[in-house]
Amino acid sequence: MTNGYAVMGNSRERSLAIALGFCMMDVLLIGGAAFLSNSLSILSDLVKEIGDTTAVLAALLTLRAVRAGPTHRFAYGIGKLENLVSISIGVLMLAAAIGIAIHAFDRISDPEAVEGTEFGLLVFGVYSVIGYTIAARQFRELRKEYSPIMASQARLWMSKATFDALMATALGLTLLFQDETFSLYLDPCAALIGVVFMLHSAYAITAASVGDLLDAALEESLQFEILRCLALHFDDYDELYRIRTRRSGSRIYVELALGYAPERPMAAVSDHTERIRVALVEVLPGADITISAAALSRAQSIGLVGSEFKMA
């Protein structure tokens, strides 16, 4: 199980490292395009790209810190750490969206002809393709195992690619109809449409992460799967004392306390608990399963005294 997490962690880190490289290159290219042009969409994209790059860098550093640290140190805190990073990404996207909206409304109230956008148009076109490619890669990672960091990054890159595609379209139409009056409003209007995408992504990221920031028991559907698994393995234990579950970010933790008759050999008890653990891992992939076994008292073993069952 540990090796599986390590491989998954390396895959996530590799995806983020690739994304960071493209982000840094994009900042340089968009910075050059903004210098050559007076386009609001290009300038606003530069501001957004700086925020995106910071968010990707923070996510990458978080995963590296977790991988470098001792496993037991981050056993429960990793979920909170992932969600805090996701919330930070949402806040950065919100701040960038507000800045873009302010500049867009200023440009609508005081229209200005856009010049020198050819290089920016090329950059937007290329990076819209790159953005959709990276987003698709990260969505594939999410299908293997959910992670708040990767979920926020996938949404961020989908939003970024859509924004770049809109900006490329707006700049292309502005060049095509540069002699028409309405072309003066295409640039700021495209920026406002991009703001809507950014606000939606920021809300989705923050709402999902805030809900997971506080540890909580698993939802009823997953608890039912645990009970169904225990029912199928009814002969593998003599008493069920307690079930405790929790979700911390992308990680699921299940703790079972089972009772066994004193005459059962320890080797048999170990085999029984292992069968239950394997069955639970099949219905809860990637979950951390802990099963503790205790000997029944003599009264319990002959059926005279029942035990208390708790599920949390």
Region spans (language model):
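The first (N-terminal) embedded transmembrane alpha-helix
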Residues: I18-I30
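Alpha-helical transmembrane segments and adjacent TM-loop junctions that form the membrane-embedded core
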Residues: T2-I18, F35-S37, S41, D45-A312
